[in-house]
Each structure stands twice: as structure tokens, then as C-alpha cells.
Amino acid sequence: MGKISSLPTQLFKICLCDFLKIKIHIMSSSHLFYLALCLLTFTSSATAGPETLCGAELVDALQFVCGPRGFYFNKPTGYGSSIRRAPQTGIVDECCFRSCDLRRLEMYCAPLKPTKSARSIRAQRHTDMPKTQKEVHLKNTSRGSAGNKTYRM
């Protein structure tokens, strides 16, 4: 014997089906077209593979992500490394031939440059101090000058 469902459950199913039939009948054909278009858009974007960045699009994306820091096409390596490494892959290999995300793009950004802070007077060397007019004149006279004057050897 088959399973007998309760009366309230059957009534709910009938009412729901009738409600949906009325709603679909009331909807105009343009509404149905837009609904189908939305469903098609969502399903096609869900099945589409990840996009790749090549050429000018890759450069534009790097400029946007890295900003004024700039970027490298190959990953920067440490200095003084004498160990032979396998050939490096660059941003083109990682983002043009395969898809990459924002974190992968950020790996190719140049490091932030430290901001130049104002040096204190104590930290300045004596050669950084401006020379007075008298000091400049004394140095020039000790070396001699052009014309009839003699030069020191």
C-alpha cells in the first residue's frame, strides 16, 4: 500500500500549485523574458571559468593594485643567493596563461619606500651646513686664480 499523506498537506500542495499557476498566468511575456534572461545570466556566469589577464589588461591591473610603488614582471629575489634555482615563473606565466587573484598580483608589487624624515641638526654632517661667504673666499684664494697670479702646487 502506498503512503497516505494527511489532508492538510494535500490542501497545502493544491493551494500552492493553484497560486503558482495564477501568478505565472498574470505575468506578462516581457516579465517572463527578463526572468529567463536573469536565470541564464546567473547560470552562465557560475559555470564560466576564471578569467586571465594578458598584455595591457595585465599592466593596467598591476598599476591599479600596486599604485605608486610600481611592480616587477618577475618575483624579486634576495641578494647574494648562490644556489641555482629552477627557472622562475613571472606574472605572465601566472596570470596570462593561468588565472590569478588579487593576492597573486600584489606579490609582484615593489616594496614600499621608507618616507624621508627630516634629519635633526645633530645628525647632519659638517659638510651639510651652508658655508659663509668668508669661508668660500678663503678657500678660493688658497688655490690661486686665473690671470697673472701663481698657482700652488
Swiss-Prot record:
Its main location: secreted. Forms a ternary complex with IGFR1 and ITGAV:ITGB3. Forms a ternary complex with IGFR1 and ITGA6:ITGB4. Forms a ternary complex with IGFBP3 and ALS. Coiled coil: none annotated. Gene3D superfamilies: Insulin-like (1.10.100.10). One of its GO terms (cellular component) is plasma membrane. Residues 49-77 are annotated as: B. The keyword Isomerase does not apply. GO terms for biological process: androgen receptor signaling pathway; blood vessel remodeling; bone development; bone mineralization involved in bone maturation; branching morphogenesis of an epithelial tube; cardiac atrium development; cell activation; cell development. This is Insulin-like growth factor 1. Residues 78-89 are annotated as: C. Residues 139-153 have a biased composition (Polar residues). SUPFAM superfamilies: Insulin-like (SSF56994). GO terms for molecular function: growth factor activity; hormone activity; insulin receptor binding; insulin-like growth factor receptor binding; integrin binding; protein serine/threonine kinase activator activity; receptor ligand activity; steroid binding. Residues 119-153 are annotated as: Disordered. Residues 90-110 are annotated as: A. The insulin-like growth factors, isolated from plasma, are structurally and functionally related to insulin but have a much higher growth-promoting activity. May be a physiological regulator of [1-14C]-2-deoxy-D-glucose (2DG) transport and glycogen synthesis in osteoblasts. Stimulates glucose transport in bone-derived osteoblastic (PyMS) cells and is effective at much lower concentrations than insulin, not only regarding glycogen and DNA synthesis but also with regard to enhancing glucose uptake. May play a role in synapse maturation. The keyword Signal applies. Residues 125-138 have a biased composition (Basic and acidic residues).
